[in-house]
């Protein structure tokens, strides 16, 4: 009886853990960056969205923004 109870508890813990995990985090970051053409420089507190945008415009891109910690420029 104790072994069956342990298996049921283990099964429920696995199901609960799986349902609470955020499996969309990686997929959303990949989908979001595929809309951009070049992602190079890491974004920091000192190198933010404004600096990223300026660098992208100076490099003849149409747009630029910090996405997932990287400066991504669009053609």
From Swiss-Prot:
Compartments in which it is found: Secreted
Coiled-coil positions: none
Pfam families linked to this entry: Defensin
Superkingdom assignment: Eukaryota
Leader sequence segment: 1-19
A Gene Ontology cellular-component term: extracellular region
Biological process according to GO: defense response to fungus; killing of cells of another organism
Keywords linked to the UniProt accession: Antimicrobial, Disulfide bond, Fungicide, Plant defense, Secreted, Signal
InterPro entries named among the record's database cross-references: Defensin-like_dom
Record has Disulfide bond as a keyword: yes
Disulfide cysteine pairs (residue numbers): 39-73, 43-66, 52-71, 56-72
Family: Belongs to the DEFL family.
Protein name: Putative defensin-like protein 55
């Amino acid at each position: 009886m104790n072994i069956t109870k342990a298996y049921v508890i283990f099964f429920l813990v696995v199901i609960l853990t799986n349902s609470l995990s955020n499996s969309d985090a990686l997929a959303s970051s990949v989908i979001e960056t595929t809309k951009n053409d070049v992602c190079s420089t890491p974004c920091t507190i000192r190198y933010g969205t404004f600096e990223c945008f300026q660098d992208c415009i100076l490099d003849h891109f149409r747009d630029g923004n910090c996405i997932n910690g990287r400066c991504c420029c669009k053609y």
